[in-house]
Design a protein with these regions (language model features):
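Conserved active-site alpha-helix within GNAT-family acetyltransferase domains
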Residues: 93, 118-136
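Acetyl-CoA-dependent GNAT
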Residues: 2-3, 7-85, 102, 106, ...
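Conserved beta-strand-loop-alpha-helix junction that forms the acyl-donor binding cleft
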Residues: 114-124, 140-144, 150
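Conserved beta-strand segments that form the floor/walls of ligand-binding pockets within enzyme
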Residues: 76, 81, 113-115, 146
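A short, internal acetyl-CoA/4′-phosphopantetheine-binding micro-motif in the GNAT/acyltransferase core
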Residues: 80-91, 116-117
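Conserved GNAT acetyl-CoA-binding A-motif
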Residues: 105-115
Length: 151
């Protein structure tokens, strides 16, 4: 397994993301995109996202992750998705470890936060495993957690 994170997502890979997401439907899209991006996913909707990164295993594009916003000494990440055929194989763990290491290279960043829906059990398990802890619980409109990892 040779996971690499690279800034940006090219046109062909954006089209792959749309295909993976749209095939699995609106609930899947909400899991990884949140509620601010309407279904179905299109090239234009992903293209508009800033600070997005490609995830590769060796040379194969397998997913995307985003630095959503900077909040003083915290970076909020999200929109983390893998090719559905690559889940459950350790790629998500390795990709998130790489992204965490990349972010923490900036010594001014003290923490990383993310939001996860309660129904997205596999993602929450991954975040727990990598040291994220629940920082805030949001109960409406759908139960979700803001989780945070400190340096």
């Amino acid at each position: 397994m040779g996971i690499k994170i690279e800034k940006g997502v090219n046109k062909n890979n954006i089209e792959l993301l749309c295909s993976w997401s749209n095939e699995l439907g609106s609930v899947f899209q909400e899991q990884w995109m949140g509620t601010q991006v309407s279904y179905p996913l299109t090239y234009e909707k992903i293209e508009k996202l800033e600070n997005k990164f490609s995830i590769f295993n060796e040379e194969e594009f397998i997913g995307m992750i985003q630095e959503v916003r900077i909040e003083e000494d915290n970076i909020h990440i999200g929109r983390f998705v893998l090719n559905p055929q690559k889940t459950g194989l350790g790629f998500g763990t390795e990709a998130l470890k790489e992204f965490i290491d990349f972010i923490f290279k900036d010594k001014n960043i003290r923490s990383i936060s993310l939001t996860v829906f309660d129904f997205n059990k596999n993602a929450k398990q991954l975040y727990d495993k990598l040291g994220f802890v629940v920082d805030e619980v949001i109960e409406t409109p759908k139960l979700k957690y803001i989780m945070k990892k400190h340096r």
